[in-house]
């Protein structure tokens, strides 16, 4: 067998751990499924890449939470409860029974379907996406080099810090390989060491690298949480509120950044109220913007906070949609002008930003791949988002959800 590319069960995003905690508390017996989609279909695996991917996925069964990893989590993630560790002591990946993996050697279509108990399958998404990306750039597109990645990351960090941006690495899922992500983090750490404010490198969403380099680990919540609850309850009008309340019940005053666009931000804000029984707008520290026009989003959120008597200057918008350094700086300035704090979760632009070796003036394009919740408790799951191109799920289920929410179908 080839060397494992994923060497730790913690080589994933923090929100997978926190969502597992919430699932254990609220939906321990829920059955779910997930589906892989390649939004860059011309970037397809060859047979060699698929063979390597299949072997790597099988190897996930060898990963377990190590004692030193548990020790680090207990110290640095106090919001994870004893029930989380009790579960993790027994947990192991079971790819043979949880994953349907198929590859058509003629069309080069790759199919990945994950199924099982939510608590047993929630950890697959991030390593599988990282492995698909790595397999493509290991065996199909080899016209790139890690040379210069440290310097590139250092320069990005310098510009962001000098501009006032507070930012985090969100790049695990679409990285070229783990080595690239590690080099990038080293470059960002060096920039943080060399340049003092007004911005700052806040750390990474990757738990393994946070532990390895003693970085802050950060994360919000994924669309998966809202999508799953909406499918389970079949109540799209109340899904955001139910999901938010259960999140608060689980974590209290920690990890309170709300993701607003699962069923559109307009729908979310209807249940994001203040001075009511829920008081969610006061309780949550801020919101995350992940689709649509960011400037319109900033204005909308600031206006909403003001309309319900919440001072927007006490809140933060975490931007995470297709960011690069220039875009972060633009949005930082726009948030500042509108009177709200900002932070940035930068993914692909950090861990898959390359030029072609054969023609350095040409970009080596990253893959655009996702794994999304497909169903929960037998009901199709959907994501509507603030961008029509980011709608996810069975078309009939999307139409049904939009009818419930009084959203335009087209």
From Swiss-Prot:
PANTHER family: NICOTINATE PHOSPHORIBOSYLTRANSFERASE
A Gene Ontology cellular-component term: mitochondrion
Domain of life: Eukaryota
Family: Belongs to the NAPRTase family.
Residues bound to 5-phospho-alpha-D-ribose 1-diphosphate: 348
Record text on cofactor binding: Activity is highest with Mn(2+).
Biological or metabolic pathway of the protein: Cofactor biosynthesis; NAD(+) biosynthesis; nicotinate D-ribonucleotide from nicotinate: step 1/1
Name of protein: Probable nicotinate phosphoribosyltransferase
Cofactor annotation: Mg(2+); Mn(2+)
Purpose: Catalyzes the first step in the biosynthesis of NAD from nicotinic acid, the ATP-dependent synthesis of beta-nicotinate D-ribonucleotide from nicotinate and 5-phospho-D-ribose 1-phosphate. Helps prevent cellular oxidative stress via its role in NAD biosynthesis.
């Amino acid at each position: 067998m080839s060397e494992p590319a994923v060497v730790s069960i913690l080589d994933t995003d923090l929100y997978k751990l926190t969502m597992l905690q919430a699932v254990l508390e609220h939906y321990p017996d829920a059955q779910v499924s997930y589906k892989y989609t390649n939004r860059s279909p011309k970037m397809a695996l060859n047979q060699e890449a698929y063979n390597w991917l299949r072997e790597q996925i099988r190897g996930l069964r060898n990963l377990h939470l190590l004692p030193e990893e548990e020790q680090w989590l207990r110290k640095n993630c106090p919001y994870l409860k004893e029930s989380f560790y009790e579960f993790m002591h027994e947990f192991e990946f079971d790819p043979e029974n949880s994953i349907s993996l198929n590859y058509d050697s003629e069309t080069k279509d790759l199919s990945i379907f994950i199924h099982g108990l939510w608590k047993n399958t929630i950890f697959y998404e991030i390593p599988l996406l990282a492995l698909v990306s790595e397999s493509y750039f290991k065996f199909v597109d080899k016209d790139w080099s890690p040379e210069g990645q440290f310097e590139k990351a250092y320069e990005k960090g310098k510009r962001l810090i000098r501009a006032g941006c507070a930012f985090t690495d969100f790049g695990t899922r679409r990285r070229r390989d783990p080595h690239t992500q590690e080099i990038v983090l080293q470059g960002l750490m060096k920039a943080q060491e060399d340049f003092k404010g007004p911005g700052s490198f806040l750390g990474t969403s990757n738990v393994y690298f946070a532990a390895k380099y003693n970085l802050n680990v950060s994360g919000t919540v994924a669309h998966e949480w809202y999508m799953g609850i909406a499918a389970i309850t079949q109540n799209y009008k109340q899904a955001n509120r139910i999901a938010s309340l259960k999140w608060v019940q689980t974590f209290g005053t920690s990890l309170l950044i709300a993701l607003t666009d699962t069923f559109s931000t307009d729908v979310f804000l209807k249940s994001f109220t203040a001075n009511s029984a829920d008081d969610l707008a006061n309780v949550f520290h801020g919101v995350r913007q992940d689709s649509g026009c960011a400037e319109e989003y900033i204005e909308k959120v600031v206006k909403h906070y003001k309309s319900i008597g919440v001072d927007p200057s006490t809140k933060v918008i975490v931007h995470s949609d297709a960011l690069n350094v220039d875009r972060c700086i633009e949005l930082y300035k726009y948030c500042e002008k509108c009177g709200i704090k900002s932070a940035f979760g930068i993914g692909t632009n950090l861990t898959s930003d390359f030029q072609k070796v054969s023609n350095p003036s040409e970009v080596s394009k990253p893959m655009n791949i996702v794994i999304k919740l497909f169903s929960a408790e037998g009901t199709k799951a959907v994501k509507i988002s603030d961008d029509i191109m980011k709608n996810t799920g069975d078309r009939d289920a999307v139409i049904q959800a939009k009818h419930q929410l009084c959203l335009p179908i087209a």
